[in-house]
Structures are given as structure tokens and as C-alpha cells.
Amino acid sequence: MKPIGKARKKLLVIGLDGVAHEMLAGAAGRPSLLPGMKGFFSGRAARMTVSIPEISAVSWSSFMTGTQPGEHGIFGFVDLVPGSYQIRFPDFRDLKAAPFFIELGAHGKRSVIINLPATYPARPIPGVLVSGFVALELERAVFPPRYLSMLKQAGYQVDIDAGKGRDRKVEFLADLHCALKVRKQVADRLWEREDWDVFMFTVTGTDRLQHFLYDACADERHEFHDDFRAFFHEVDETAVDFMKRAADRPDMEVLALSDHGFGHIRSEVYLNPLLKQNGFFSSEASDAKGLPGISGRATAFALDPSRLYVHRKGKFPRGNVADADYEKVRRDLKDLFSAVEIGGRKAIRRVYYAEELYSGAQMSAAPDLLLLSEPGYDLKAGMEKEREAGTSHFTGMHRQDNAFLACSRPELIAADPTIFDVKGLMYRLLAI
């Protein structure tokens, strides 16, 4: 076993978006879909819990900063323009806590970061950054910009057209393989060209695949069962290639993780219709669309995927909940969602007040309550939905309680690890 001492250490990080612990470890008589990685870590991967909401923008931000949303300020893929009902899309500029690759620069360490979500637009870092999802323009997703031409020549894509997963699945699968192949080629070049201390390679196709084809994973009769397993096989080979290179270096440690787990969808659950049916939400007019049409009678609304906001006076233009009534409305919302059943089954595992999960300087932007669903119930704001539940083209959903964490020194992993612990683990592996 390689000792951790004062000598300069290097670290390889493999990120697999949405890969559940059981996909790596195997479960219920089913073998691992990532046998090479499982073997590398001698089967010692830990099950990890992640942020709430259990979505990439929040969870990867928590990973890279080692903080929760009350400190880093990213609460979802969408947020509201303060003092309005207009939706905005937070990005890397909204991150209020320092990511590890900035902090490591203060220790003279350089990082190569490839395809890490929530890092767009790319900004100067001590090393190389190729932003991950959501990145709108490749030109703004690369630092230093001298690498832009290399990425363009390689045909590099930050993300595929996930919409093909609905009804053009053959193209969708081909795009997943192509994007991973090109990303690996670019990573190979940067591995050799750059003098780095931390090298991070993230695969996001695993998340895209499971959203649309999770039902193909265990069903051997499914049309795309073999295709599902083939993509995971390619991911496994890609990761193990890097990991074997690291193992040949006595100064290098390895860490792998996912930002959330995954599971099957029994039903989608639409929060704003539930609020409307129970008298908490109403619109200005019958034909009003979206949140900008909320009425002054509404006392609450929801944003994706599981965030509830009390419609407070002074905070929102038509808010009508006075400070004196705030806690009562929160209690009423907690009672409502704690009791929600879909098809006779309990849909919500737990309702949290924001302060139970978050603290810090960004709390003014936090939702008032957050929901954690039971496995199988995929929560959505559902602003345009009429019913409280339904199904769609998605067959797989994120889970908060079955991500994974593994490293070359498993004894350093805390009992019951969370994604907020990973940055500290990285620093221990780097002997900082």
C-alpha cells in the first residue's frame, strides 16, 4: 500500500454522473456493470448520500466546494430573478464558494478538469478547464482558450442532444458512444501535454442513458438491453484505462464517485398541481401560463425538482403571506406533502425545512421547504400539468441515497459518507 507522506502526490478523479452504488458493486444477484472498476477497488466502494435536491447542478457544486447550497449558492438548475417571477439559469459565475481546483492553486498545484458539470462558463484556473453540462458555447467552455482549436478539430461535444432519447434511440446511443470516445481522446492528449497534480474526467452519458433507458438495464428482453450494457462496458474500459495508468505511478492516488444515484420511475409527481388542488396555488387568470401568472391569493409555489416557496409579502411582487403567518404556512405545507399518496403508496419520504439542510450566507435565496421522495416517485414542479401525477418518456430518476464513492485508500473514507465529505478526502489523498 502506498504511504501518504510529505512527498508531492497526484490524484486521478473519475466522475460518473448518476451511477448508483449497485451499478458498481452489483446487487440482488445482478453482477456489476463496471467490473473493471469494481476489481480495481477490490469491491470496496462505499454507498454515499448526496445533496437535496439530488441533481447535478447542486451535487457537483457541493462536491467541488465541499459545502452545501446555503454556502455555495446553487439551489437548482433554475432559480428566480430576485424580486420577480422570472426564471434564470444559475451558472459557474453564481458559485459563491471556492472549488477545489482554485484552492489547490494556492498550494502550487495544477488541475486538469474535463467535463465537470456546473463549471460553465469556464474561467481561468491553475491548469485546464473544459466545462461540462450546461455549456451553451464551446468557445466559452475552455480555459486556456488555446485548447479550443484542438477540441473543435476532434469534434468535441460538451453534451449530446438528449432529446433523441425520446424517439430516436438508435441515434441517441450512437451519439453517446461517439461523445465518450472523443472526450477520451481529448483527455489522453491533456494527460500527456499538461503538468498536473489533479486530473478529473467526468462521464455524463451515464445519466442521459438511464433517464431514457433505465428500464432496459435489468430486462433482458428489452430491445436496448444489450446496448445499455455495452455503453456501461465502454465507460468501464475508459475509466480503467486511466486508473491503470495511475496505478503504475507510485505518487498517484485514485478516487471515483457519482453525484447521485439512480432508480426506476413508478410515477412522476407534479407539485404545483398538488398545491393548486389543496388551495395553496392559483393563477391570475384561467389562461395564465407559468409562474409569472401566479395570483396574489397564492400562498406557495414549487420550482424543480422538489423546492417549495412560501409566497411571502415583501419577497415576491404579489406575495400575500405575512411574516406572522409564515411558520403556519410552512407547517401546513409539511403536513400536506408528508401525507401525499400516489396510487395508494406514500410518495414523499421526508419534508425538510430549509434550515434543516442548509446554513450560510446564501440562505436568503434558499427555498422554504424541500422534499425527498420515496424511491420510484420523481418530483417535478409541473407548472403546466393538470394532474398531480403521470408518466413521460423518462424511465429512470435520480436518487439521493445510492451514489457511490471509492478510492485507492478506502480506509480514509468516512462511515456513511456524503458528497460534502469528498473534497476533504481528496486533500487527504493529496497529503495536504
For the regions a language model picked out, list residue spans one by one.
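A long, amphipathic alpha-helix that forms part
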Residues: I4-G5, A174-F199, L209-L255, Y326-E341
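Short secondary-structure boundary/capping segments
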Residues: A27-P31, V128-V130, D215-D219, E268-Q277, ...
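Low-complexity, glycine/alanine/valine/leucine- and proline-rich hydrophobic stretches
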Residues: L370-G424
